[in-house]
Design a protein with these regions (language model features):
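Long, contiguous interaction/recruitment modules in multidomain scaffold/adaptor proteins
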Residues: 5, 10-45, 152-156, 163, ...
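Terminal, low-structured helical/coil segments at or just beyond the last alpha-helical repeat
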Residues: 28-41, 183, 188-192, 213, ...
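Alpha-helical segment of the N-proximal tetratricopeptide repeat
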Residues: 47-81, 88-91, 95, 200, ...
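Helix-start (N-cap) detector for alpha-helical repeat units in TPR-like alpha-solenoids
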Residues: 49, 83-84, 117-118, 151-152, ...
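Structural signature of tandem alpha-helical TPR/SEL1-like repeats
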Residues: 61-74, 95-108, 118, 129-142, ...
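Structural marker of alpha-solenoid helical repeat scaffolds
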Residues: 78, 112, 146, 180, ...
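Alpha-helical adaptor scaffolds
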Residues: 91, 107, 125, 431-434, ...
Length: 574
């Protein structure tokens, strides 16, 4: 909602189609009367009613809703079948926020006159405002089938398609309203609100040059109007044009200093440019001006994390949570910071809280499962991932993780089924193929295992698990000459894994390369001893099954974040 005198135009904003189009509808009703014939006295009555309805529309424009309603009801009482009267009464209800009553009157008007452009356009606005975009689109499309030049319906339809992500169609509609010519420039008299909407659509459609030209024009037309400059800055920031957005926010700040929303958005844009010092100053100012707002604190936490200041980051996010308890992004980032700093158990409740507050984020489930995987709690990890798979059945990643956890439990059939579901959604995934190859090898299907593992390596020449498992398989099959180059490539990828050195020791021994074998055995013993001292009792060497030693893992648990994860938070608008 607009605050502090600023006007915001966003993808869900709708032009008001109300009184003016009702007036147009009166003329239309004369052409499409609900009565097939009228005698002279009936015609006179209708003329009087039209005059009365125009008077009501004028009163409504003047803000005198009660007087307008009284006239509209009198007209309806005298002529219950008069569609325009029902339409006007619907507008009155609409302006009062009585959506159900307004919709009833619009639909009654359309029942009486299915070609009432005004009623259909007004119904479309109401449907969009009450979060029924598909019905609203249908309504506006119907308006344009009756009146192809209806500018408000064209504009609103363009915004609805933009909100749906169909930017090319949105651009075509908005260009039609703006009268865009071959040089992609709207008519000189085009409303700035429309130009801003069109610029946003261009940015989302990847039409950067058109967006830049239009932004130049908007900025020039805006002069020193902070509302327009700020709104244009928001549009550009949303389109990742942060450099130019920063300049517009700085101009806005100079024209309207000490506005927290301006400083907040300036800080966010600077953060996205990695200008962390400047971003922190802007956000600190925003936080000081709006101490009850958690968003600047949240962003300051991201900056502290990026600066490798975990304690400061956690303090900012905890303060943000003290201001807004239901803040899934803050809970998630606290968990990320703790997890990144090897405090997985402390992170777990924050991940769980983030999921409970916003179960629509797949990444939250992935990270919570990773906490369990790190502790080899495969059953708990699988439970988390299966919950996510139920919510995100089309995610290849989550089915892969279900399989990963099932493999850790030693449930190879369940793991195979999950991996195959993942592969069906995302063919040629080398990690999934490597896992399927491992499972085939464990079940004695050696030809299938070799084929799958070689395919994984062909797709990803640096896939360590595929190299390890293929080398181990070839050693098992006594194909030592073939195994050696595979295992040597694997050890070049990870020199710290004991299992790979044990396999090399075995291959060198069978090939009578005593010096190489002794070297690899010594390395194996040293690494294994270090592993045991480190508290990891996982088996090594050729032991398969559910132990999942480092050399035998399909791939490491989900990568730990090295920097704050990207969390989409809507820009704050004054």
């Amino acid at each position: 909602m607009a605050r502090a005198g600023f006007v915001i135009v966003c993808a869900t904003a709708l032009a008001v189609v109300g009184v003016l189009t009702v007036t147009d509808g009166l003329a239309q009703t004369r052409r499409h009367s609900t009565a097939s014939t009228q005698d002279k006295s009936g015609g006179a009555r209708r003329s009087d009613q039209e005059v009365a309805l125009r008077e009501a529309a004028t009163l409504l424009q003047a803000g005198k809703r009660d007087e307008a309603e009284a006239i509209a009801r009198r007209v309806i009482s005298a002529s219950p079948l008069y569609a325009d009267a029902h339409n006007l009464l619907g507008v009155i209800f609409d302006q009062r926020g009585q959506a159900a009553e307004a919709e009833r009157e619009y639909r009654e008007a359309l029942r009486l006159d299915s070609k009432s452009v005004s009623a259909r356009a007004n119904l479309g606005v109401l449907l969009a405002r009450t979060n029924r975009p598909d019905q609203a689109i249908e309504s506006f499309e119907s308006v344009l089938s009756l009146d192809p030049n209806h500018s408000e319906a064209t504009y609103n339809l363009g915004l609805l398609y933009a909100a749906r992500g169909d930017y090319e169609r949105a651009a075509s509609l908005l260009e039609r309203v703006a009268g865009v010519g071959p040089n992609a420039q709207p008519r000189a008299e085009t409303d700035l609100r429309l130009q801003l909407a069109l610029a946003s659509v261009y940015l989302h459609a990847g039409r950067a040059k058109d967006a830049a030209r239009l932004a130049d024009r908007i900025e020039q037309a805006a002069g020193d109007d902070p509302r327009v400059l700020f709104t244009l800055g928001l549009q550009l920031a949303e389109g990742s044009e942060y450099e130019r957005a920063v300049k517009l926010f700085e101009r806005t700040n100079a024209l309207r200093p000490n506005t927290p929303e301006v400083l907040y958005n300036l800080g966010v844009a600077l953060y996205n440019l990695n200008r962390l010092e400047e971003a922190a100053r802007a956000l600190e100012s925003a936080a000081a001006l709006a101490p009850a707002d958690p968003q600047p604190l949240y962003r300051l936490g991201l900056i502290a994390s990026a600066r490798s200041q975990p304690d400061a980051a956690l303090t900012f996010w905890q303060k943000a949570l003290s201001l807004r308890e239901r803040f899934p992004e803050a809970n998630f980032m606290i968990a990320e910071e703790l997890f990144k700093n090897r405090r997985g158990e402390a992170a777990r409740p924050f991940y769980e809280r983030a999921i409970s507050q916003d179960p629509s984020k797949l990444l939250y489930y992935v990270r919570l499962g990773a906490v369990h995987l790190r502790q080899r709690r495969y059953s708990q990890a699988r439970e988390v991932y299966e919950q996510a798979a139920g919510r995100f059945p089309d995610s290849a990643e989550i089915h892969y993780l279900v399989g990963y956890a099932a493999r850790g439990q030693g449930l190879f059939e369940e793991a195979r089924a999950a991996f195959e579901r993942s592969l069906a959604l995302k063919p040629d995934n080398p990690d999934v193929l490597a896992n399927l190859g491992f499972l085939a090898s464990q079940n004695g299907r050696v030809e299938e295992a070799e084929r799958l593992l070689r395919r994984a390596i062909a797709l990803d020449a640096k896939n360590f698990p595929a190299h390890y498992d293929l080398g181990r398989l070839l050693v098992r099959l006594k194909r030592y000459d073939e195994a050696l180059p595979v295992l040597e490539r694997a050890t070049a990828m990870d020199k710290t894994d004991p299992g790979i050195h044990y396999q090399l020791f075995t291959a060198y021994s069978r090939l009578k390369r005593r010096e190489d074998a002794e070297r690899e055995l010594a390395i194996f013993k040293r690494l294994e001893e270090a592993r045991k001292k480190g508290g990891d009792g996982a088996s090594t060497g050729d032991g398969g099954g559910s132990s999942m030693s480092a050399g035998e893992e399909p791939m490491p648990p989900p990568a730990e974040p090295t920097e704050p994860a990207t969390v989409n938070v809507a820009p704050k608008t004054p």
